[in-house]
């Protein structure tokens, strides 16, 4: 069990909000980083003690990471506001994140920098080692549990998001499988230097994740955004599956959201299970496909893959030109996940127009990676595959 300390304005609301998340074991309100030992609420209220209303959070980092806790905390505050949150004013209501383990500094500062970059200006949130913490009076502990109608500076939408976020995590954990939790990190290449480095898995199958997403298909964009920031792979997938449902009812906002939150679409299954059904579906209905070529030029491989895989919906409508152009752009790509994506889309074209695919292969097979070629001709007869592979092999030998 680990500890972190959050100051987010009135500690009644902050404790209730943070305490709702799965993995948070215990919370305690108190007064932190002031000059007076063991102060009372009345003394802190004068703003002369230097103390800040604070919540001590004890959590299981096997369920929720410090980085995720910090991101969720930032969702509950206005990080630009000085000595004020909601209607509460005074230095006791300043915001901050304080740690007792120096190893936690890196995670706090990483999230802090992310938020500061998003706002584009300095944050008014303290971040440093805890100097002191004194528990508040019993009256202030679990105040909103004991007084459900009591004062809370946080909005109802923020509290609802926290409650539903916790429900999603609980449902995913309940659906997890111990064996899959061991196998999936290897399958998705999460080792150092691999494409999925650092990704974490609960061990939930896609069908079970779909079931959880379906139960939360009316979720807010705020919840989807929070889930996309999770370290858990299945949480991000669940968010994307919810977003697909959103797209069916409100396509324009859903596509805009998707394109501005691609950082969380960072493994091949997350791309393949979302891009065709959000961006791809959007492209079928809209003539401007420039976004595909913007994504294709991205230095982020996942965004490159999104550009290619999104065209699956166009292919299903027998519109092949964008796929062909992108296949030419990525003819000499070195990453096997891009080679496979291009080959996959070419194969889909071949299912509908084999002559067009054969013409493309005859023109470009000399530059085409063998992986791309193998994927593209998977539906060909054994003789056709053998002939193309042999011709490719001869070309490769000649080049050497």
What are these regions (language model features)?
Residues 107, 165-400:
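Alpha-helical scaffold domains
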Residues 1-167, 215:
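Flexible coil/turn and secondary-structure edge motifs
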């Amino acid at each position: 069990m680990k500890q972190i300390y959050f100051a987010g304005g009135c500690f009644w609301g902050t404790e209730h909000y943070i305490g709702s998340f799965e993995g948070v074991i215990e919370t305690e309100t108190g007064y932190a980083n002031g000059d007076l030992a063991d102060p009372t609420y009345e003394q802190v209220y004068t703003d002369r003690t230097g103390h800040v209303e604070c919540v001590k959070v004890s959590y299981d980092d096997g369920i929720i990471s410090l980085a995720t806790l910090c991101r969720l905390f930032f969702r509950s505050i206005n990080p630009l506001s000085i000595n004020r949150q909601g209607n509460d004013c005074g230095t006791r209501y300043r915001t901050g994140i304080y740690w007792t383990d120096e190893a936690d500094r890196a995670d706090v500062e990483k999230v802090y920098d992310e938020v500061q970059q998003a706002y584009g200006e300095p944050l008014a949130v303290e971040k440093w080692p805890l100097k002191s913490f004194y528990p508040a009076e019993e009256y202030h502990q679990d105040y909103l549990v004991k007084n459900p109608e009591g004062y809370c500076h946080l909005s109802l939408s923020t509290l609802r998001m926290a409650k539903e976020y916790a429900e999603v995590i609980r449902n995913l954990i309940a659906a997890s499988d111990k064996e899959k939790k061991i196998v999936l990190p290897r399958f998705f290449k999460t080792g150092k230097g691999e494409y999925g480095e650092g990704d974490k898995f609960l061990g939930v199958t896609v069908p079970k994740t779909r079931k959880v997403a379906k139960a939360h298909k009316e979720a807010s964009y705020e919840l989807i955004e929070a889930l996309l920031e999770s370290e858990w792979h299945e949480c991000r997938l669940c968010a994307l599956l919810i977003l697909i449902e959103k797209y069916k009812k409100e396509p324009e906002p859903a596509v805009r959201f998707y394109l501005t939150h691609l950082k969380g679409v960072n493994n091949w299954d997350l791309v393949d299970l979302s891009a065709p059904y959000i961006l791809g579906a959007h492209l079928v209905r809209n003539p401007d496909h420039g976004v595909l070529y913007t994504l294709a030029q991205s230095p982020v491989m996942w965004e490159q893959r999104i550009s290619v895989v999104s065209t699956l919906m166009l292919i299903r409508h027998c519109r092949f030109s964008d796929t062909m152009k992108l296949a030419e752009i990525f003819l000499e790509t070195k990453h096997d996940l891009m080679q496979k994506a291009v080959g996959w889309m070419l194969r889909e074209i071949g299912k509908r127009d084999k002559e067009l695919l054969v013409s493309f292969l005859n023109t470009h097979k000399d530059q085409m990676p063998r992986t791309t070629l193998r994927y593209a001709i998977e539906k060909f007869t054994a003789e056709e595959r053998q002939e193309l592979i042999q011709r490719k092999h001869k070309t490769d030998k000649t080049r050497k």
